[in-house]
């Protein structure tokens, strides 16, 4: 039997405050990069739960998603290993909540607030081209209701309880 190809599903939080966007500076196999708070969908969680968790882990902030900015697919090829991965990214916007006194996720160096102009100026340090694309879509007012996404209870662990 042939293996079935599967993309890597990720989530990202597009968080804007006073014309600036919340990013993380992180260590990657290709060097230090900027990214939105983002990460992989874990087993037994919804996409919304994943973006809440990733934002907390990477920024120490609570996050409440209010809309889906977009769904994006891109291919990443490591400059170091030539490994290819296709990502399917779900980008959310929402409300930033309380900050907690907790360490940031492993590999996250710090959080940074950047203007759109600053984001453009440092594109060479973006984790992927989707960092800028998601912000541009957000700035264009692109939003879809969260009701567009449906997670059946069997996908979030109800069958495992």
Q: Where is each model-derived feature located?
A:
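Charged phosphate-binding loop/patch that engages nucleotide di/tri-phosphates or the phosphate backbone
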Residues: 133-161
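Conserved N-terminal beta-strand and adjoining loop/helix that marks the start
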Residues: 1-22, 40
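Conserved Nudix-box catalytic region and its N-terminal flanking loop in Nudix hydrolases
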Residues: 17-57, 153
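Residue-level signal for pocket-adjacent positions within structured domains
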Residues: 4, 29-31, 36, 99, ...
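Unchanged
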Residues: 41-64, 75-129, 160-161
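Short connector loops at helix/strand junctions that flank enzyme active sites
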Residues: 8, 16, 36, 63, ...
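Residue-level recognition of beta-strand microenvironments
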Residues: 68-71
